């Protein structure tokens, strides 16, 4: 059966065959046939249980992955270097296999006896962190949340037994705030680095410094594109490894003329493929939940109208706020023919750009690429950050077309012209750090003790104006003093996994005797939309929403929904009957509990104003204003709203619950579409601006507008009241 290993195993030197327990150390192990036959007698080294039959079935597939052939080269290279850049096409197996190779090597190393190390693998998206960790737990034949776990915002599925942890890049950044040297980790893997998310870019600079202070820590940067040379240069010439994908040729088709309606064109193309092309699943890229759900309905309807002349279809949506169980449906097989020998069934996945690189879906032969994605954009001059539907980059187009060649030669239908591809698309997607509001990032860096932001080692430094705006916002919120140092309030704000305005609102809520209510509002704002509006029952859904409506605005409407949910014992049937999203409500309840724990840690009082008091809703609105005083709009005589200070013309979003047009409103979100909308709005009083945020509403540097004149009157009124009060004394 082969010779036994004689030499001592050192870190990253070799990796044991994962089909063997730590007690069975034959160099070639058992052949797969023997392993399958006697698998029940082999002990899983991770949990001490017998391996299941499924483990060996999966192992056979793992050994077919391109990355498997390079595991020895990978471990040897990492053993000799502190940092390694690895480029691998989506489908090469890098996201699932590299962390397991590393974990095996860490566990096999005897140099740290008694020390429990973690291997961390970051993902830019929550969906990927959850989905990949479940897959890897399956491959290792362990329970998710035990030896393998994941950590995303407001959800920690790990335990004291966890050795391999998939987490969003934002969560690793939060861990660094509590543990600046990330002492629990032996190896950190930054996956999907080409996506250049805000958190990943900050982690680049942070980990570069941590590596200097921790020679025992190793870093693997994994990318799906060849921009990796830039990573190499940034990490001082770290070695670069390339793992080939398993791509078959993909034929690219362009449109002759630009499409006026890419959604309609995408649906039309799906139907044409299903009618005319050989069997094979279809992947359609669209920009967001609403668009995807609309497309799924229309595709089902169009195919249904074709009757028996075509095979059955299974249309599956995929976007970040979809429940995990629904997300897993993308891995289901295509439906079988309706009759024996009849037309083949086909799976049609309609996805956001999450399917570009984060997840690999086998069986895809046809890709439909309209050439758009939602991207974050930020204008620091007017302090507006919004998601805009924008053209993708050439790199993204390449990733999308590559999804079609995973299992056999495929076809990609680009719903734009070849000229547009060559002349209009940028080579790479702009890093998020160059198009984002950096207030939260600056707060995180300050908490990490990084004061010199201008000289922080960003791979692509943000514009100075964007940094200055972030510092200004944090100063107005009281998170930074005038010298730019973190205040006590800022320390507490940084502990909340929320935007700075919401954190400030929570911290000051006890002063307004309404922290219980502000906790509920914050939780509701942190989860997907709680209102369900099915196309076939829109009128009934709108009537149900109106029953929760509060005349003073949307924040109080959300509070009403949360209270009703709790009063009805969190009953899913109540949610269904009232067109309320049960999953969103469960998430809100979970988020609220976590926020309560943070409040308790800082001895922030839990309190409420008497519900029957006239001040009940007034206090809640004042507390909200204390956080969102920079997001105020004023009703002009022309009938439209103007954002205060920035003078942007905006309109109340049609989804609002107000029964009137208040003179002043705070808003939670600025939405750029065909018109500029403010969404989630609440009525406030002008005099509260003077009382709650006088430091911001300094009229000496205010633009000349109706809001300024209204505020001047309010200041004069306050001055008169003060003088009258003095005279009475």
Curated annotation (Swiss-Prot):
InterPro entries: DEAD-box_helicase_OB_fold (IPR011709), DEAD/DEAH_box_helicase_dom (IPR011545), DHX15_DEXHc (IPR044756), HA2_WH (IPR048333), Helicase-assoc_dom (IPR007502), Helicase_ATP-bd (IPR014001), Helicase_C-like (IPR001650), P-loop_NTPase (IPR027417)
Residues given in the record as ATP binding sites: 88-95
Domain of life: Eukaryota
Keywords, comma-separated and alphabetical: ATP-binding, Helicase, Hydrolase, mRNA processing, mRNA splicing, Nucleotide-binding, Spliceosome
Catalyzed reactions per annotation: ATP + H2O = ADP + phosphate + H(+)
Motif window: DEAH box: 191-194
GO molecular function: ATP binding; ATP hydrolysis activity; mRNA binding; RNA helicase activity
GO CC entries: chloroplast envelope; spliceosomal complex
PROSITE patterns membership: HELICASE_ATP_BIND_1, HELICASE_CTER
Transmembrane helix keyword on record: no
EC class name: hydrolase
GO biological process, one term: RNA splicing
Residue ranges constituting the Helicase C-terminal domain according to the UniProt record: 269-449
Parts forming coiled coils: none
Signal peptide residue numbers: none
CDD domains to which the protein is assigned, alphabetical: DEXHc_DHX15, SF2_C_RHA
Helicase ATP-binding domain residues: 75-244
Pfam families per record: DEAD (PF00270), HA2_C (PF21010), HA2_N (PF04408), Helicase_C (PF00271), OB_NTP_bind (PF07717)
Enzyme Commission number(s) of this protein: 3.6.4.13
Family: Belongs to the DEAD box helicase family. DEAH subfamily. PRP43 sub-subfamily.
General function of this protein: May be involved in pre-mRNA splicing.
Designated name of the protein: Probable pre-mRNA-splicing factor ATP-dependent RNA helicase DEAH3
């Amino acid at each position: 059966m082969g010779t036994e290993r004689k030499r001592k195993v050192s870190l990253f030197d070799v990796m044991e065959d994962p089909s063997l327990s730590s007690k069975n150390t034959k160099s070639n192990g058992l052949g797969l046939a023997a392993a399958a036959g006697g698998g029940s007698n082999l002990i899983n080294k991770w949990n001490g249980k017998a391996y299941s039959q499924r483990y060996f079935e999966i192992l056979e597939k793992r050994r077919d992955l391109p990355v498997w052939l390079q595991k020895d080269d990978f471990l040897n290279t990492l053993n000799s270097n502190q940092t390694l850049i690895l480029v691998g096409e989506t489908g090469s197996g890098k996201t699932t296999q590299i962390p397991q190779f590393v974990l095996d090597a860490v566990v096999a190393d005897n140099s740290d006896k008694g020390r429990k190390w973690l291997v961390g693998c970051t993902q830019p998206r929550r969906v990927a962190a959850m989905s990949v960790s479940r897959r890897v737990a399956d491959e290792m034949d362990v329970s998710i949340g035990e030896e393998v776990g994941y950590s995303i915002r407001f959800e920690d599925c790990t335990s004291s037994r966890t050795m391999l942890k998939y987490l969003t890049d934002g969560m690793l950044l939060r861990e660094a705030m509590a543990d600046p040297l990330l002492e629990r980790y032996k190896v950190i893997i930054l996956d999907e680095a080409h996506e250049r998310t805000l958190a990943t870019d900050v982690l680049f600079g942070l980990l570069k410094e941590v590596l200097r202070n921790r020679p025992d820590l190793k870093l693997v940067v994994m990318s799906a594109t060849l921009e990796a040379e830039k990573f190499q240069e940034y990490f001082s010439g770290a070695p670069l490894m390339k793992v080939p994908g398993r791509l078959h040729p993909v034929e690219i088709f362009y449109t002759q003329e630009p499409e006026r309606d890419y959604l309609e064109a995408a649906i039309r193309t799906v139907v044409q493929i299903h009618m005319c092309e050989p069997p094979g699943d279809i992947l359609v890229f669209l920009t967001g939940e609403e668009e995807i759900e609309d497309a799924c309905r229309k595709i089902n309807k169009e195919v249904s109208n074709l009757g028996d002349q075509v095979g059955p279809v299974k249309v599956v949506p995929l976007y970040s706020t979809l429940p995990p169980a629904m997300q897993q449906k993308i891995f289901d097989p295509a439906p079988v023919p309706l009759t024996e020998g009849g037309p083949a069934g086909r799976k049609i996945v309609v996805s956001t750009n999450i399917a570009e690189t984060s997840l690999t879906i086998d069986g895809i032969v046809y890709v439909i690429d309209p050439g758009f994605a939602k991207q974050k954009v930020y204008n620091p001059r007017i302090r507006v950050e919004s998601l805009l539907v924008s053209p993708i980059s050439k790199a993204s187009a390449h990733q999308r077309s590559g999804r079609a060649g995973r299992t056999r030669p495929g076809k990609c239908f680009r719903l734009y012209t070849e000229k547009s591809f060559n002349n209009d698309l940028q080579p790479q997607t702009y890093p998020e750090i160059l198009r984002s509001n950096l207030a939260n990032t600056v707060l995180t860096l300050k908490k990490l003790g990084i004061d010199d932001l201008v000289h922080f080692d960003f791979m692509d430094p943000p514009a100075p104006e964007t940094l200055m705006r972030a510092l200004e916002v944090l100063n107005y919120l009281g998170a930074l003093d005038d010298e730019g140092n973190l205040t006590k309030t800022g320390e507490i704000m940084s502990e909340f996994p929320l935007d700075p305005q919401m954190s400030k609102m929570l911290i000051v809520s006890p002063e307004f005797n309404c922290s219980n209510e502000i906790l509920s509002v914050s939780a509701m704002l942190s989860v997907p939309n709680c209102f369900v509006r099915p196309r076939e029952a829109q009128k009934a859904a709108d009537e149900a929403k109106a029953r929760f409506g509060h005349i003073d605005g949307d924040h109080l409407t959300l509070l009403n929904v949360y209270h009703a949910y709790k009063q009805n014992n969190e009953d899913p049937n109540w949610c269904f009957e009232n067109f309320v999203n049960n999953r969103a409500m469960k998430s809100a309840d979970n988020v609220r509990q976590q926020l309560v724990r943070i409040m308790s840690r800082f001895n922030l009082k839990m309190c409420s104003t008497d519900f029957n008091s006239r001040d009940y809703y007034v206090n809640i609105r004042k507390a909200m204003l204390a956080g969102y005083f920079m997001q105020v709009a004023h009703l002009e005589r022309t009938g439209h709203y103007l954002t205060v200070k920035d003078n942007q013309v905006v309109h109340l979003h049609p989804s609002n619950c107000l029964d009137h047009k208040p003179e002043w409103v705070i808003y939670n979100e600025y939405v750029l579409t065909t018109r500029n909308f403010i969404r989630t709005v609440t009525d406030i009083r002008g005099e509260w601006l003077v009382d709650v945020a006088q430091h911001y509403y300094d009229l000496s540097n205010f633009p000349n507008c109706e809001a300024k004149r209204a505020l001047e009157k309010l200041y004069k009124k306050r001055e008169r009241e003060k003088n009258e009060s003095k005279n009475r004394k």
